[in-house]
Amino acid sequence: MTTIVSVRRNGQVVVGGDGQVSLGNTVMKGNARKVRRLYNGKVLAGFAGGTADAFTLFELFERKLEMHQGHLLKSAVELAKDWRTDRALRKLEAMLIVADEKESLIITGIGDVVQPEEDQILAIGSGGNYALSAARALVENTELSAHEIVEKSLRIAGDICVFTNTNFTIEELPN
């Protein structure tokens, strides 16, 4: 699978992910780009799960953003509704973290839209719990930037999770 983590701190939101693509227990690619900018660079999105499924979801989510003038929550809810009700989409196996300058969300494969806890940290994928734990500890105990926290959290997840590597893509938006 993978690890995607998002941290919002001091007017900055950062989303990062590793580059490993696995097929079963085999590493197929080590430099995939699982974090992207959408909607003219105003929205960050990262995926965990099936690569082809995620690209389909990126396209659908970007269409929703266009349809709803970039309103992140409305677009996420509309995508989740479609994901839940459309037979073809229901078979897609992926999760998304999406963020703009105001909010961050997880969109799940079962059609849920999840907002972060007060700490504004989100993580998904096989290494998500490791990255989430690391990010929370770093936010609570350091003055590191959001970018530094995302990078360190991904590195910790990559050291623990066999489905996560240390080839990162990290994108950020200032507030």
Curated annotation (Swiss-Prot):
Protease found in the keyword field: yes
Molecular-function GO term, any one: threonine-type endopeptidase activity
Binding site for Na(+): G158, C161, T164
Catalysed transformations (reactions): ATP-dependent cleavage of peptide bonds with broad specificity
GO biological process, one term: proteolysis involved in protein catabolic process
Regulation: Allosterically activated by HslU binding.
Catalytic residues as annotated in Swiss-Prot or TrEMBL: T2
EC number: 3.4.25.2
Keywords assigned: Allosteric enzyme, Cytoplasm, Hydrolase, Metal-binding, Protease, Sodium, Threonine protease
Gene3D superfamilies found in the cross-reference section: Glutamine Phosphoribosylpyrophosphate, subunit 1, domain 1
Any GO CC annotation of this UniProt entry: HslUV protease complex
NCBIfam families: ATP_dep_HslV (TIGR03692), PRK05456.1 (NF003964)
Family: Belongs to the peptidase T1B family. HslV subfamily.
Function: Protease subunit of a proteasome-like degradation complex believed to be a general protein degrading machinery.
HAMAP family assigned: HslV
Protein name per its UniProtKB record: ATP-dependent protease subunit HslV
Lineage, opening ranks: Bacteria, Pseudomonadati, Pseudomonadota, Gammaproteobacteria, Pasteurellales
